[in-house]
A protein has these predicted regions:
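Long, charged/polar, low-complexity intrinsically disordered N-terminal extensions
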Residues: 1-68
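Extended hydrophobic secondary-structure segments that form protein cores and membrane-embedded regions
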Residues: 296, 386-394
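A short acidic/basic microdomain associated with nuclease active sites
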Residues: 284-311
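Catalytic cores of nucleic-acid endonucleases
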Residues: 323-387
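Short secondary-structure boundary/capping segments
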Residues: 333-337, 403-410
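Conserved catalytic cores of phosphodiester-cleaving nucleases, focusing on short active-site segments
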Residues: 281, 308-310, 317-323
Length: 472
């Protein structure tokens, strides 16, 4: 039992009377306590003896106390509407990342397809030899790296509490576990160099750069902990899955010596993400009432309108994809100005350098504006009555609470939806790649515009996304 009887009875009453059921321990709380442990606790094996004391030596209460330290003390009522949205978004981001339903298979598939099937072609301006750059940085091929990540994750996903109690299996791994599977010893060393660190190393990293209580960047960077000798264990399987998805990109990025090379890598990754999204939606819309058009071009000058258009009956969904990563500082520091500036930079842009929603609104004005309508090559838009602007982000921020409403609020300063009358332009919708992957399964039987309209009808502010609805 983790709690004193009087505490346990109160918790049981609270849990039994709550709907939906409440939990005592949750992922972010556990990661937060682990973070404090590596930062401030002594590296002493005798500490483990405390677990044999009654009520875990008080650790249960420490977990409950951790809950009070996970939230930012930001005055809410005195803020503007935009600032209130940012405050809710800051809290939602950490909830989404820790509690959100994340598909392991989607992460594996997305990582593999972006790397192996949909990179920019060799010889194009966006091409970057990520295979060679990653091998130079890590000593591994991308295939070896992904296979080793999947192997470790599979071990932990198959592990049961009963196996651990019966000592039929263990949360601890050794280098021998890999070599028994036929993996070359040098490859194992290279892999563990990338994904693991000792508690002392993690402490140094967190003490050097830590943007707030919810910042688990270093656990994501090194999701496997090295303890005594060559014993290893994964701190968190979701961090391992995130490493599988983005580890190759960041290991390569951190090895590059110039900003020019890093810019080329980011451009390559953005094109790979766009190619992946177009493939996903093309497959989802095939033989359905949704007609999918990737990379549509203006008839007059051949420039790209937006990343894709989907015609759903008399509706048109204009899509823009953004592969940018939102910085840890902006997501976890609690600084409203930092988060606003990052969203402005990555998802909005300026009139001279448009990003995200500025690209979408400009495309809609160009095609449907009363005084500047421009034909789109090979797409008949004459029967379109309603236009849906949809932004898709590779970063999870696209699924956080309030992001659609926040982007709409910002768009109102440079885009008047009434200027497109008699056609109707809906407010802006925003989804993460995880969100669009989820709804793509329904496009064979349902119009995309109907799904978006249903979202709007039930939640006119579009505060809840398809991901946050499941956790908040």
């Amino acid at each position: 039992m983790a709690f004193l009887p009087e505490h346990a009875s109160r918790l049981e009453r609270m849990m039994s009377s709550a709907s939906p059921p409440m939990v005592v321990f949750h992922r972010m709380q556990i990661l937060f306590v682990a973070k404090q442990a590596v930062m401030f606790c002594e590296d002493d094996e005798n500490v483990l003896d405390r677990f044999r004391d009654p009520y875990w030596g008080g650790l249960g209460l420490a977990f409950l106390m951790a809950n009070d330290l996970l939230h930012f003390d930001l005055a809410y009522r005195e803020r503007t509407t935009t600032q209130q949205l940012l405050i809710r978004m800051i809290h939602s981001i950490s909830l989404l990342e820790s509690w959100g339903r994340s598909s392991f298979t989607s992460r594996v598939g997305r990582a593999w397809l972006m790397l192996k099937r949909f990179p920019p072609p060799q010889g194009s301006t966006s091409y970057f030899n990520i295979e060679q750059a990653f091998r130079n940085a890590s000593g591994l091929s991308t295939e070896e790296y992904l296979a080793l990540c999947v192997g470790v994750i599979s071990h932990y996903l198959d592990l049961t509490f009963e196996q651990i109690i019966a000592m039929d299996n263990s949360i601890a791994l050794t280098k021998e576990w890999f070599t028994k599977a036929g993996v070359d010893s040098k490859s194992v060393d290279n892999f563990l160099e990338d994904v693991s660190a000792s508690p002392a190393t993690m402490a140094t990293k967190f003490l050097t750069k830590n943007w707030g209580p919810s910042d688990m960047t270093w656990f994501r960077d090194k999701p496997v902990c090295r303890v005594t000798g060559d014993v290893l264990f994964a701190l968190d399987t979701k961090c391992l899955a995130e490493k599988l998805e983005s580890g190759i990109f960041w290991r390569t990025h951190n090895s590059l010596g110039t900003n020019k090379e890093k810019h080329r890598l980011h451009n390559y990754w953005g094109v790979a993400f766009e190619n992946y999204m177009n493939w996903l939606l093309e497959q989802a819309c095939r033989n359905s009432q949704n007609r999918f058009y990737p990379s549509p071009k203006y008839e007059k000058n051949g420039e790209e309108v937006c990343d894709a258009i989907i015609i759903s009956g008399s509706d048109a969904v204009f899509l823009e994809y953004k592969g940018s990563t939102i910085t840890a500082e902006s997501k976890y520091s609690g600084d409203l100005h930092e988060l606003a500036a990052e969203i402005e930079s990555k998802l909005i842009g300026t009139e001279s350098k448009r990003k995200g929603i500025r690209q979408l609104t400009r495309a809609i004005l160009n095609v449907f504006g009363k005084h500047s309508s421009v034909a789109v090559r090979d797409i008949d838009l004459s029967q379109v009555d309603t236009i849906f602007p949809l932004l898709v982000t590779r970063d999870d921020i696209g699924g956080c609470w309030g992001i659609s409403q926040y982007l709409q609020t910002k768009a109102e300063s440079f885009f008047n939806r009434r200027s497109i009358k008699p056609k109707t332009v809906t407010p802006i919708f925003c989804l993460s790649s995880e969100g669009i992957e989820g709804i793509s399964a329904y496009l064979q039987d349902e119009l995309l515009s109907n799904l978006l309209h249903g979202w709007y009808r039930n939640d006119p502010g579009r505060y809840w996304s398809f991901q946050t609805k499941t956790i908040l």
